Amino acid sequence: MKNKGFIAAASALMLMSPFASAGNPVQMWKCNINGDVAEEAVMAQAGKWKAAASALPGGEGMMVWSLYPVAVGADGDGTDVKLVVAWSSFTAYGQWWDAYPASDVAQLERETMTCHGSALWESEDA
């Protein structure tokens, strides 16, 4: 009888361990700057976007970076900037993503740049 309890507990731990050790979600958008918009305008707009996006459910503590190429080869997509967003958990990301597409925040990203693709990554501390 003790073996059954031990096996059940060990099985539950094995099933739950991927969730306990899950890293943080990071989404990266590949974007083109619209026309002759300056980098400073893109950064200012990214700040406005972050403030509005952080107010959505799951957005608390969200981190946002704008990445500009310094020395690169062509990526084939004409990417001028990458918008990188990280959340504290996949639960927070899920809440945020459920609210984002229908929100006014989604329109803000189009004021200075047009994003043509994104990928969701899992980050792990080294």
Named regions from a protein language model:
Residues 23-24, 84, 94:
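Macromolecular interaction modules
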Residues 97:
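Short, flexible helix/strand-to-coil boundary loops that buttress conserved ligand/catalytic motifs
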Residues 36-38, 86-92:
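Helix N-cap motif at beta-to-alpha junctions
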Residues 9-13:
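Hydrophobic helical h-region of N-terminal Sec-dependent signal peptides
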Residues 1-8:
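Bacterial N-terminal signal peptides that target proteins for export
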Residues 17-18:
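N-terminal signal peptide c-region/cleavage motif recognized by signal peptidases
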Residues 38-65, 100-105:
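Short amphipathic alpha-helical segments
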Residues 22-26, 32, 61-79, 104-126:
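Glycine-rich beta-strand-turn "strand-cap" elements at beta-sheet edges
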